Amino acid sequence: MEPKAPQLRRRERQGEEQENGACGEGNTRTHRAPDLVQWTRHMEAVKTQCLEQAQRELAELMDRAIWEAVQAYPKQDRPLPSTASDSTRKTQELHPGKRKVFITRKSLLDELMGVQHFRTIYHMFIAGLCVLIISTLAIDFIDEGRLMLEFDLLLFSFGQLPLALMMWVPMFLSTLLLPYQTLRLWARPRSGGAWTLGASLGCVLLAAHAAVLCVLPVHVSVKHELPPASRCVLVFEQVRFLMKSYSFLRETVPGIFCVRGGKGICTPSFSSYLYFLFCPTLIYRETYPRTPSIRWNYVAKNFAQALGCLLYACFILGRLCVPVFANMSREPFSTRALLLSILHATGPGIFMLLLIFFAFLHCWLNAFAEMLRFGDRMFYRDWWNSTSFSNYYRTWNVVVHDWLYSYVYQDGLWLLGRQGRGAAMLGVFLVSALVHEYIFCFVLGFFYPVMLILFLVVGGLLNFTMNDRHTGPAWNILMWTFLFLGQGIQVSLYCQEWYARRHCPLPQPTFWELVTPRSWSCHP
């Protein structure tokens, strides 16, 4: 019995220690709980940052590795695994600069939609559309006693759409047949005068192609006074066809003219060119990475989202812009009114920018990519995280940036040498600014170089001053501030000019009256 006494005493002491420990733990648990929550949140944030950084670095590493492999492979004495034509291989040998490499990858927003926090932001935008619809119904019910949505602005913008779609057919046929036939004529064996005659005929076909694309849309839109949205269809297809046909010839013609010995060369297949005209890229390749199947529910979802963005934009213009700017030209001009109108337009302007980005660069391009099983969905990158305008211009629209980089910047370096980097970059800005201004002039029906000045002058200065050396959240805030102000200036000035030309029409305007802003002198 005696040996059990020490054991009993030890058990009693252990019980007391456990009770004291439990009491102490209960006292400290309430103090440690907030620290544990904060520490958990901190670790989750660190984990998210590490994963995002690792994903970006891995993607860049893989892109670089694939590009280096593609560049190094033709130098070996082995045939390419793809069925690339002789002209494509000759082009790669002639221009050893960095070429666009297509790989299978998702769009960034599709990846971010898998994160619940980002999906909530998407839901907030949908809730904003619902609020606009409710407010429109409430205002119409209070003012006019009816509960019905009117889409007058939408119907006006898309007026005469069938005519615009009819004009698309000859534009498409011209792009489909004439450049490809020109390439076939130039690829014939160079023997005697037959090749010279064929080459001359090819130049005539290209001139006819350029005339159809440049003259027909302008003539139809001016003669029939097409509204803005119908003009958008024509001008975007006009620019797209010109850029695609140029890329097709630019990628194939150099290899053809470098063939020696008077031999002919195998031209790309017609099916590859036809696929290129519809796939969402402006860089021609004979083959692209393809997905295994088509998700038709994904296609329908993207088209529905694009339609929702269109309705969203109409509600924003109808509720936030039209009431403000419709009668502004009837009032005397003042700097105060102009400044207030610009600041008022910053909100609608940035909303329009985001809607255009999401509707076109994400929904529309992804829908066509899915229908055509086009694998490379990197139509944009994380431009919203940019801390410099140079990075913003590179990541906002990757589709157009790739074309400008390949055929304006790199060709400029090839012609001017490495010392001409500044001139090549200036050429990129000049081409982009002129095309943007042409699109605005075509759609709105008047010349008002707001976009030209903002893009070429202000954007060019910001590109060279706010470069990639600047990092940190302050620079991102500054970039967004300039975006807000720039969008406010565009929306305000273009809306004022639109209504001024309707309030103060000129019966027989001269050339200078056509190019002079009417909002500067219209005060009926």
Swiss-Prot record:
Motif (FYXDWWN motif): 379-385
Highest taxon in the source lineage: Eukaryota
Catalysis performed (reactions): a sterol + a long-chain fatty acyl-CoA = a long-chain 3-hydroxysterol ester + CoA; cholesterol + an acyl-CoA = a cholesterol ester + CoA; cholesterol + (9Z)-octadecenoyl-CoA = cholesteryl (9Z-octadecenoate) + CoA; (5Z,8Z,11Z,14Z,17Z)-eicosapentaenoyl-CoA + cholesterol = (5Z,8Z,11Z,14Z,17Z-eicosapentaenoyl)-cholesterol + CoA
Transmembrane parts of this sequence: 119-140, 161-186, 199-222, 231-254, 296-328, 346-371, 420-444, 451-466, 473-504
Active-site residues per Swiss-Prot or TrEMBL entry: 436
Residue numbers binding cholesterol: 117
Modification after translation: Polyubiquitinated by AMFR/gp78 at Cys-279, leading to its degradation when the lipid levels are low. Association with AMFR/gp78 is mediated via interaction with INSIG1. High concentration of cholesterol and fatty acid results in Cys-279 oxidation, preventing ubiquitination at the same site, resulting in protein stabilization.
Any single GO BP term: cholesterol homeostasis
Subcellular location: Endoplasmic reticulum membrane
Signal peptide range in chain numbering: none
Cysteine sulfenic acid (-SOH): residues carrying this PTM: 279
Intrachain disulfide bonds: none
InterPro entries listed in its UniProt record: MBOAT_fam (IPR004299), Oat_ACAT_DAG_ARE (IPR014371), Sterol_acyltranf_meta (IPR030687)
Gene Ontology cellular component list: brush border; endoplasmic reticulum; endoplasmic reticulum membrane; membrane
Chain positions recorded as an acyl-CoA binding sites: 391, 394, 397, 401, 409, 432
EC number(s) reported in the record: 2.3.1.26
Classification via Pfam families: MBOAT
Official protein name in the record: Sterol O-acyltransferase 2
Organism: Rattus norvegicus (Rat)
Lineage, broadest ranks: Eukaryota, Metazoa, Chordata, Craniata, Vertebrata
